Regions:
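Glycine-rich beta->alpha junctions and the first turn(s) of the following alpha-helix
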Residues: 96-168
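A structural signal for short hydrophobic beta-strand segments in well-ordered beta-sheet cores
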Residues: 40-43
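Short glycine/proline-enriched turns and hinge-like loops at secondary-structure junctions
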Residues: 34-36, 62-66, 80-83, 108-110, ...
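Internal helix-loop-helix
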Residues: 1-10, 61-68, 80, 147, ...
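FAD-binding glycine-rich core of flavoenzymes that anchor FAD
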Residues: 1-28, 46-51
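A short core secondary-structure module
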Residues: 50-98
Length: 168
């Protein structure tokens, strides 16, 4: 169902996932591969019912098509990576916008874009896992995704070799 849903199969946040398009928003312009340097913030409202999301993500695959995004943001920047938290964010909420589209050399069948969050109100129920678990969740997600990319590359290379052998 998901890597870190705390209520798999019963979680009311996830039905849309089955028919919508998703994006994983971790990388930032000033953080690069250092996820712990995340500057996107999620400030909890005084009554605790919402978080206000502000920041910018870059190199986000298929962000311009996404119906929702798994977004990593800091709830406490003084904690570094231990303050990172993941949220399920509706990509059509007010304050969510798509920025620059990258002109890539390879893997051009998927779009890669910036995503800007400006005072985006998200419900506290949008939390994936718990506050402070965002770094762990993101790393597990990347671990699984990287294995999939490696597998896909092996399959692509096999097909290339088979096609090349036809002409040899």
């Amino acid at each position: 169902e998901t890597l870190m849903s705390d209520r798999p199969g019963r979680d009311p946040r996830w039905p849309k996932k089955r028919s919508g398009f998703a994006a994983f928003a971790l990388t930032e312009p000033d953080a690069g591969s250092d996820a712990g340097a995340c500057r996107t913030t999620a400030d909890k409202t005084p009554d605790g019912s919402e978080y206000i999301l502000n920041g910018r993500k870059c190199f986000i695959t298929n962000a311009c098509y996404a119906d929702f995004m798994c977004v990593v943001a800091s709830v406490d920047r003084s904690l570094g990576y231990k303050g990172l938290t993941m949220f399920l964010v509706d990509a059509h909420l007010p304050g969510v916008s798509i920025g620059k589209h990258e002109d890539k050399m390879g893997i051009r069948q998927s779009a890669t874009c910036d995503v800007i969050f400006e005072d985006v109100h998200i419900p506290a129920s949008a939390l994936i896992g718990k506050e402070g678990e965002g770094f762990k969740i993101a790393m597990k997600t990347l671990e699984q995704g990287r294995a999939s990319v490696g597998s896909a590359c092996v399959g692509i290379m096999r097909a290339i070799l088979e096609e090349a052998a036809k002409y040899a």
